[in-house]
Amino acid sequence: MTIFDNYEVWFVIGSQHLYGPETLRQVTQHAEHVVNALNTEAKLPCKLVLKPLGTTPDEITAICRDANYDDRCAGLVVWLHTFSPAKMWINGLTMLNKPLLQFHTQFNAALPWDSIDMDFMNLNQTAHGGREFGFIGARMRQQHAVVTGHWQDKQAHERIGSWMRQAVSKQDTRHLKVCRFGDNMREVAVTDGDKVAAQIKFGFSVNTWAVGDLVQVVNSISDGDVNALVDEYESCYTMTPATQIHGEKRQNVLEAARIELGMKRFLEQGGFHAFTTTFEDLHGLKQLPGLAVQRLMQQGYGFAGEGDWKTAALLRIMKVMSTGLQGGTSFMEDYTYHFEKGNDLVLGSHMLEVCPSIAVEEKPILDVQHLGIGGKDDPARLIFNTQTGPAIVASLIDLGDRYRLLVNCIDTVKTPHSLPKLPVANALWKAQPDLPSASEAWILAGGAHHTVFSHALNLNDMRQFAEMHDIEITVIDNDTRLPAFKDALRWNEVYYGFRR
């Protein structure tokens, strides 16, 4: 994915004419220097574009209006270099619909103790200019992020870069189209929800296409294209004897390749970047898409099983956020437990569809084995274990009056034994703070059995996501205590009830 190449972030300097043209000239010089340095040295995911100074209400309003209508603009970074009276910002901020970050910095790192005078003081007023800007944001109840630190500080760079990822993700989400092949798994509650409310809140659209429409595209794929893709499989994966040429399951691999090519063509033609399937709605497909889904996820598509469009959309969003970061992000399900005093574990997996981006093996195993659900031919799938280390699992649920994001911090561990009879990819983890507390908190908060698993993102990333989209977040980590967690759920009911 090269999605960050499609966007830029505008760097806006707030000032005023009170200090005279010489001060404004120096402000402009400083801004040019800082933007050039950040673009060159800070390893930001997006390019910063310096805009003209905002020194009057009309100038500021024009910048905000232009940002709204420029599809390449993912958001604004504002630096209050001098004091910039915040009433000048009201009209612009009222209309601004792009993410906003205040960079609370100043050009100099150290004070020039021997030479500091009032000219220096008037030029470098971030300390109180930023507070004036912060007041108007609070007064207007406008969500915006704040990063404090010198512009050469690596931690400030990382925080700005993290915010940029969120800003780009939000713009991508506004254009996201989710395709559901078939409907929801019958009688399942948590995977359903209000698609209209989701489009109003997040911007992504969700619509259903008959599986027959997909089958028509799958059947149009040429044998030559199928064989070329299977050649790619041969080079990327460890093929079991049954899947190799003349193997008894070779035809199943060919059919999986045809499904992958058909799915990708369908998604590309429709402009979809997330999709769902369900094993109860496979009419015309010879097998449940497993290998196809795994590979499409690795290419950046969002996915969830059983018609779970919220998790599919969340996976796409988190894939965009984590583009270029170390570690993978995948669809996941809490499947079964290992209870052992002091070593409780969760085994996560799904019927087939776990993304290879989280695999520890360089070449996962490609195999075809029986699947007792769905009533179709044995499906192809990739089998692998997961990288170890800190990770998160996240779930987005519809509570009717609002959306709630649940995040559990986890520690992925190595599987202590081989799993010779488990023919699916899997992840094994310890839930924070412990399995009883984590599972009870998750259940009390209504968390889904489907999640997005990520090594690339962390809790701070998901907090930013929730803040930027103005949704509730509940966190389960090493600091979680059930009595306080229950209290927080009750307080949230009151808070969000008042906001209706």
From Swiss-Prot:
Which pathway does the record list?
A: Carbohydrate degradation; L-arabinose degradation via L-ribulose; D-xylulose 5-phosphate from L-arabinose (bacterial route): step 1/3
Sites where the protein binds Mn(2+):
306, 333, 350, 450
Record's GO cellular component terms: cytosol
Its UniProt entry gives the catalysed reaction(s) as: beta-L-arabinopyranose = L-ribulose
EC main group: isomerase
Q: How is the cofactor bound?
A: Binds 1 Mn(2+) ion per subunit.
Enzyme Commission no: 5.3.1.4
GO biological process: what's one of them?
L-arabinose catabolic process to xylulose 5-phosphate
The protein's GO terms of the molecular function aspect are: L-arabinose isomerase activity; manganese ion binding
Q: Which InterPro entries does the record associate with it?
A: Ara_Isoase_C, AraA_central, AraA_N, AraA_N_sf, Fuc/Ara_isomerase_C, Fucose_isomerase_N/cen_sf, Lara_isomerase
Keyword set, alphabetical order: Arabinose catabolism, Carbohydrate metabolism, Isomerase, Manganese, Metal-binding
Name its co-factor(s). Answer: Mn(2+)
Q: What does this protein do?
A: Catalyzes the conversion of L-arabinose to L-ribulose.
Subunit note: Homohexamer.
The family this protein is said to belong to = Belongs to the arabinose isomerase family.
Write down what this protein is called.
L-arabinose isomerase
- List the lineage, top down: Bacteria, Pseudomonadati, Pseudomonadota, Gammaproteobacteria, Enterobacterales
Q: Which gene holds the coding sequence for this protein?
A: araA
